[in-house]
Amino acid sequence: MDGNAAPLDEICKLAEKYDALVMVDECHSAGVLGKTGRGITELYNLRGQVDILTGTLGKAFGGAVGGFTTGRKEIIDMLRQRSRPYLFSNSLPPAVVGAGIETFKMLAESHELHDRLVANVEHFRAGMMAAGFDIKPTQSAICAVMLYDAKLSQDFAARLQDEGIFVTGFYYPVVPKGQARIRVQVSAGHTTEQLDRCIAAFVKIGKEMNVIK
């Protein structure tokens, strides 16, 4: 929920010690974390040392439906026979699969989108913090604007929509009590002008609602 990364290096050491397998869900990290956006395994220099990786095509890889699981051949062969979600689901549309493959190729051939995403996240965070908002530390594209009050987060999100900014307020039970926030997903597709417009809307409403001075 906060965009922070698990201590995967320590987890892998424990798995090796106790002869366990490691499965990592890269839904929020693939295309984002690591020097070239290859995910949390690249961030910790653990590529090839994780047994099972799962991910989604619904976030960095184009915003489509569906997802994927990858790993050693013997593991994937077993999952094809034993994984109930796989066995009892329909296949993805060919157009979705084709678009996903092309997105993988784009990210493998160029780091431009990843670098732009990193720059956009830094720009948004810096602008929001300079305005006086409480922003949780993050290693991803998720920027949590902390408001702490459930109703405030809902009202704030509604006012942002009035300003043409679509965000979602999160509150208990999605997050712990007293930890309500607005979660902003920054994209490589955002322009600097769009990010500045978003920051300006936050500042305007933040002052209206006495969140910032």
Name each region found by the language model.
Residues M1-D2, S29-L33, Y86-L87, A144, ...:
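Short, small-residue-enriched loops and turns at beta-alpha junctions
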Residues M1-L21, L152-S153, E193:
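Active-site core of PLP-dependent enzymes with the aminotransferase class I/II
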Residues K17-Y18, A131, E163, M209:
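Helix C-cap/helix->beta junction micro-motif
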Residues T36, E42-M78:
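Active-site PLP attachment segment
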Residues F61-M128, F133-K136:
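PLP-dependent aminotransferase class I/II
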Residues S110, D115-F124, M129-G164, V174, ...:
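Conserved PLP-binding catalytic core of the aspartate aminotransferase-like
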Residues D162-I165, V174-K213:
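PLP-dependent enzyme catalytic core of the Aspartate aminotransferase-like
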